[in-house]
A protein has these predicted regions:
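Pol beta-like nucleotidyltransferase catalytic core
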Residues: 2-86, 98-183, 196-205, 214-356
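A short, histidine- and acid-enriched strand-loop-helix "catalytic/donor-clamping" loop
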Residues: 87-94
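Conserved active-site histidine-acidic residue motif and adjacent donor-binding/catalytic loop
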Residues: 187-197
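Short Ser/Thr-rich beta->loop micro-motif in glycosyltransferases that lines
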Residues: 208-210
């Protein structure tokens, strides 16, 4: 049943491989004002806590202090029904596997249905942690208004063929040749300490996802809005289910000439200035609706099953630990991974060969 305001706050433990070190310092930066209480939720970031009503795992369980592959095992202090996994990578990069997914009561994901064999999937954007460089509180009160330059992008030198990295890299390099004013940041290009440097001084930002599927928009778009930029965007096909149409300019990077003309026209006719109200609204949506903890603070109470019945104490294992302890299951996971990778490759091929 949905959580009631009359009850005590739900205590939700949050674990993440991405925040294995110093989670109590790192994760509160993504909470409004750094407060652990948000709506009906009290967030718990202590990895050894055993007093909680819910467990949320972001991508995978944390690394153990010795480092290397995650050996973490979490002895549940709540019913398995009150657990949630958030997938943080597309199907072209990570296959979570049926057995790992089965450990959780719910899965929040932007992966395709055929990649998530689970009875309770929630297909949505996943509130992926942003790389913008400012805390939630800092971003909320500091809209970048001093824009000195036109256009930037952040693009690594990755050129994997099984994802859209290679297409993104090729498009970016070609665009730089046509538009020398494009500032390219990232590994293999111009170094930055923080993504703020690549966003705050610029009016426009080229944001290209490495995967194309519904609901899959990432920090590449969220960071752009947080930096107060107008995105030239390629990625999530239903992005306008989330943001106002005036808040971004979609591109099809398979058509370079049309994309180049779209970018030049937008800059020439000052689209940034005319679309500024929509950018403000998109930025508000990121901070208040789609950011990880505000989003979860609404979702978890709606999923909550309150029970006073005793429940069997169970264990959730990291992906690595599960495969290590279930060698036969690991073989089946390898087969599952191969099958999903083939499906992802077919999907990519169909997308690249589809009419423009």
């Amino acid at each position: 049943m949905p959580f009631s305001d009359k009850q005590m706050p739900l205590r939700v433990k949050f674990l993440s491989k991405a925040a294995s070190a110093r989670p109590t310092e790192y994760l509160p930066r993504y909470l409004p004002n750094g407060e652990h209480r948000l709506g009906e939720i009290e967030w718990i970031f202590q990895q050894d806590s055993t007093q909680y009503d819910w467990l949320v795992v972001y991508d995978d369980l944390p690394l153990t202090p010795s480092g290397g592959n995650s050996q973490w095992e979490e002895k549940l202090a709540c019913p398995r029904e009150n657990t949630l996994l958030i997938t943080a990578e597309p199907s072209t990069i990570k296959v979570y596997g049926k057995a790992f997914l089965a450990q959780f009561g719910h899965v929040l994901t932007s992966q395709e249905p055929w990649a998530i064999p689970h009875p309770n999937p929630i297909f949505s954007q996943c509130g992926l942690l942003w790389f913008y460089g400012k805390s939630h509180q800092e971003a909320s009160i500091d809209f970048p208004i001093h824009k000195k330059f036109d256009i930037s992008t952040v693009c690594s030198s990755k050129q994997q063929k099984h994802t859209l990295h290679s297409l993104r890299h090729e498009f970016t390099c070609r665009l730089k040749m046509e538009m020398p004013e494009l500032e390219v940041f990232g590994h293999g290009h111009r170094f930055i300490q923080s993504k703020v440097e690549a966003l705050d001084p610029f009016r426009y930002h080229l944001a290209i996802e490495n995967h194309f599927t519904p609901h899959h928009w990432t920090e590449k778009l969220a960071d752009t809005f947080l930096g107060g930029c107008l995105p030239f965007y390629f990625g999530c096909p239903n992005v306008f289910d989330y943001f106002p149409e005036e808040s971004l300019i979609p591109l099809d990077i398979r058509d370079f000439e049309q994309s180049l003309e779209t970018i030049r026209q937008a800059i020439r006719y000052k689209a940034y200035e005319t679309r500024l109200p929509a950018i403000h609204e998109a930025r508000r949506l990121v901070l208040e609706e789609y950011a990880l903890f505000p989003m979860l603070s609404r979702l978890v109470p709606n999923l909550h099953q309150s029970t006073k019945k005793a429940f069997a104490i169970e264990v959730i294992q990291s992906r690595h630990t599960w495969r290590k302890k279930h060698p036969i299951g690991a073989i089946f996971y390898g087969l599952e991974r191969w099958q999903i990778s083939k499906m992802a490759a077919r999907q990519k091929k169909a997308f690249l060969s589809a009419p423009l």
